[in-house]
């Protein structure tokens, strides 16, 4: 199985959880240092791992990565599309980052992976969206819009790929905290914002990456064989 954006945070947690279940895993990310650290963690979890640097906004590089991962894994049955450029600013650059990384990298990754998953007899695509795609996103308009597009595309893909025995589902995490992540930074540099988010969650805390990862493993498993086209929020009731 492949996880794009798999060197830290939610992506790394997903790769680790799949490795614990015995899956051979491939991850990609832009930075070699984080990728090397992630490889060590996944191997410690007992997994076989292929890791390669890749700028997923580059169509050729993404295609090359998918092909190298399939060769290293000797096939493919699960793709987790987890890249995020987190386009924050409501300007040309913010929108372009969101479109190139959050949306088109997911689309192109799917195009590259689907023939291999079909060849394996079927499997699953799992896309990472966000609760920002389910509601208004005043602070980050591009991010909310592209994450909403991911949710819609999930439904379309589910219909397109059912006859290939490929299920397509989407995870919409809420505010998830991990070292080096957005909310870790906010906790240190914008405690007022961090506290407001923390107080908006009924459980009084932010989520952890492994709480998202466990759902991804379920959606990739035979236990979810009759689930497709769904978007599931993992937010501790943040949107209630």
Residue ranges and their predicted role:
Residues 205-234, 239:
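C-terminal substrate-recognition "lid" of short-chain dehydrogenase/reductases
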Residues 7-9:
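Conserved glycine-rich cofactor-binding loop
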Residues 110, 146, 154:
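Active-site helix of classical SDR
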Residues 162, 167, 227-229:
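Short, small/polar-rich loop/turn modules that mediate ligand/substrate recognition or access, typified
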Residues 115, 159-160, 225:
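Alpha-helical segment proximal to the catalytic Tyr-Lys
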Residues 163, 175-200:
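A glycine/serine/threonine-rich, flexible loop-to-helix segment
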Residues 130:
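Residue(s) in the substrate-gating loop at a strand-loop-helix junction
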